[in-house]
């Protein structure tokens, strides 16, 4: 049996909303039914659809071609774990977050989080939870998103000011607004 590699495949989003994630997942699985693949999730961002897949590298071009039935492929990112310098990781996580790549934000920040302790660890856990909450929003899981945002607020409670280039006070305000209104909106960190 072939070894599968994990990829994030990004398709252009011309019309979909987060509530469409399950139907896009079904369509994608149907379009790719003849291939030995795993499609874990579909997440819907403003400008792209993010398909979390495991594929044989040998089938990648065929899968890419088939996925044009769902949307134009704009990026393919093979997922590999790498250790980065803390400052580089935090900068990358911020860029990913601001580009609505919340799953990858979560992954990059976890790499930093596991090497921290105390207040910094709690702060990073809060930011990771915000990213995780927004992953659920992109899957159309609004109630789960709000629930995780509440947990994030608990972790962020004791923090303020700037953490590298992240304004923690602005982050907390955005999260509080979402929790209080239960209206999920895009924001940057």
Regions found by a protein language model. Name each.
Residues 1-99, 103, 159-189:
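N-terminal alpha-helical interaction modules that lie
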Residues 85, 118, 122-125:
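Residues that mark the junctions of alpha-helical repeat units in TPR/alpha-solenoid scaffolds
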Residues 97, 102, 109-110, 149-150, ...:
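Inward-facing hydrophobic residues that define packing positions of alpha-helical scaffold repeats
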Residues 117-120, 158-162:
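Short coil/turn linkers that connect adjacent helices within long alpha-helical scaffolds
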Residues 142-160:
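TPR/TPR-like (Sel1-like) alpha-helical repeat modules
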């Amino acid at each position: 049996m072939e070894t599968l590699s994990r990829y994030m495949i990004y398709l252009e989003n011309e019309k979909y909303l987060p509530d469409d994630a399950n139907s896009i997942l079904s369509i994608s699985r149907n379009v790719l039914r003849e291939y030995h693949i795993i499609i874990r999730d579909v997440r819907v961002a403003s400008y792209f659809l993010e398909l979390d897949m495991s594929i044989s590298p040998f089938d990648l071009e065929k899968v890419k071609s088939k996925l044009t039935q769902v949307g134009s492929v704009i990026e393919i990112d093979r997922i590999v774990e790498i250790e980065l310098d803390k400052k580089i990781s935090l900068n990358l996580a911020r860029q990913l977050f601001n580009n609505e790549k919340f799953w990858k934000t979560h992954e990059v920040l976890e790499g930093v989080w596991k090497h921290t302790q105390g207040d910094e660890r709690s702060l990073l856990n809060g930011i990771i939870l915000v990213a995780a909450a927004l992953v659920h929003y992109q899957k159309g899981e609004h109630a789960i998103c709000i629930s995780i945002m509440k947990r994030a607020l608990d972790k962020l409670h004791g923090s303020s000011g700037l953490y590298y280039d992240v304004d923690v006070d602005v982050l907390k305000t955005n999260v509080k607004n979402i929790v209080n209104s239960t209206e999920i909106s895009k924001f940057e960190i």
